[in-house]
């Protein structure tokens, strides 16, 4: 599937807010508030640098939170998981809010049940698993960096053999 360029104005803003004093002091005493989950979730297969994931669900499928809905397509790619449980209402190119380009997306109608896949919240004693197993779990989870490029973390953890770190 190829992305289609569409005429759009990307939403952006200038500057932002930069408090001169300790910015955390402005909110550290504030109460935390939970946000509501969306009725419809648009999950793009390109949430990272590199090849977009390939959707592995289809219209009409019932998915659970944490379920793999997009499979990485190469080493520099990342798996995508459902952030809500519900019914897949469509899989199609949709206007990406960041890039302004139509990109493959899985659209899920939230059932409002917050049903997770089995094993999603299991933890392991990290002292008992090998570095390769940790790297494999990071890759399976689709973890990416938050530095702006959303680079797949497993790639960063796999330097060339001759590279001294």
Language-model segment annotations:
Residues 1-165:
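Well-ordered secondary-structure scaffolds
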